[in-house]
Amino acid sequence: MSHQSELIAGDILEYLSQHENKDMLRFITCGSVDDGKSTLIGRLLHDSKLIFEDQLAAIERDSKKYNTTDQDIDLALLVDGLQAEREQGITIDVAYRYFSTDKRKFIIADCPGHEQYTRNMATGASTSNLAIILIDARRGVQTQTRRHSYIVSLLGIRHVIVAVNKMDLVDYSEDVYNRIRDEYLTFAEHLDIPDIHFVPISALRGDNVVSRTEAAPWYQGATLMHLLETVQISHDAPLSAFRLPVQYVNRPNLDFRGFCGTIASGAVHPGDAVVALPSGKESRVKEIVTFDGSLSRAGAGQAVTLTLEDEIDISRGDMLVRADEARPHVSRSFDAHLVAMGEAPLRPGKEYGFKLAGKYVTGRIEAILHRTDVNTLQDSPADALALNEIGLCRISLNSPAAFDAYRDCRGSGSLILIDRLSNGTVAAGMIVAQSEEASPAALSPWALFEQELDQLLQRYFPQMTRAELARRLRDEL
């Protein structure tokens, strides 16, 4: 590695201890095509001296063939790994890179800028705490800038750094920078992004990325790296109530029965009264078990196994919550924003598999309430959602599930839709709220029969649809 830590050479155990105790920041870079996203990541790694010497040699060699800049080294090649990306000078897939500084660990997701790769960007943004939105100083706020900002807001990212890139091409003009800042802030009034920072940079030359530049003396703010190291993300989760989606029931012998999962929010202690949802059965936490031994407390992000004082029926897909805290919704129906990811359009009425925090259940899209144009943010009616389109949909499940709004808790408010024939992921969703369900008294006898039939199929033949059942009955008769 070009950068050698004295601590690594002197005391490897102390280095590992410090590294383990650093907090983690996940962020994405997004913006219009050729705004310099991959170059910026390469510059962050290069100027932080976090590139291996063999990597640097390989980039120098590849730059002679694929260089898209006037520099000796094209730093974008550190991230653009696919051959098609290098040949076209664009990003297609989401590329992840990992690095750390003295203050924090980072995971970067370099997302594609093209509209046809909206699903790729949604994937990268779904786990991020912060977004860097690049704007070309020569072009200003573009349609793709608005689209990416909308997706960032939709996916609950609360921190945005707007990096006005290529300032060297406009002679570091303060007027250009101020105009872009004001235009973006006017647009962002319609979005739910509470924390926005601006920084003028040149990713190609490294100005204001890791080190300050004297070329823009009018800018007295922090560098991009300083903002990344100091942004506060510990209070981002609005939900403080305990949520443990059960991923696995561990029963190695007759004397042990534990419920495994990663805590989505809140904290739990031995002795806490808990409720299993959707059944509503109550018990108390007997022990918090981990590989390193029992714990006196476990919090969000920790993978644990809980044992309970009572033998109650809990299965994979159920959710454990504390009895004295706010509970999630338990319902068969909710509204959610869906991002279409499959080649075939999403259509109301078709049976899909739904995966919510480890729970798999079948159901359907009851209605598409509206489709949102990600470029203009205008809503319009729609009968289907094609690849990369986003819409607000009403979902109806065949059995009840526990969930929160995505804004309150990502872990219990997100879902994916699965094609039941190919098992491919056809959409990702963010739950908005529980929708109004029809009461049983308001349903017709035929609708009640369909509900009970769906429940029986889900219980005994989970891969079979009503149409398949009807076809089999016709064949046998």
Swiss-Prot record:
Keyword Glycosyltransferase: no
GO molecular-function term, one example from the UniProt record: GTP binding
Pathway: Sulfur metabolism; hydrogen sulfide biosynthesis; sulfite from sulfate: step 1/3
Binding annotation for GTP: 31-38, 110-114, 165-168
Gene3D superfamilies linked to this entry: P-loop containing nucleotide triphosphate hydrolases (3.40.50.300), Translation factors (2.40.30.10)
Keyword Metal-binding set for record: no
Function: With CysD forms the ATP sulfurylase (ATPS) that catalyzes the adenylation of sulfate producing adenosine 5'-phosphosulfate (APS) and diphosphate, the first enzymatic step in sulfur assimilation pathway. APS synthesis involves the formation of a high-energy phosphoric-sulfuric acid anhydride bond driven by GTP hydrolysis by CysN coupled to ATP hydrolysis by CysD.
Entry protein name: Sulfate adenylyltransferase subunit 1
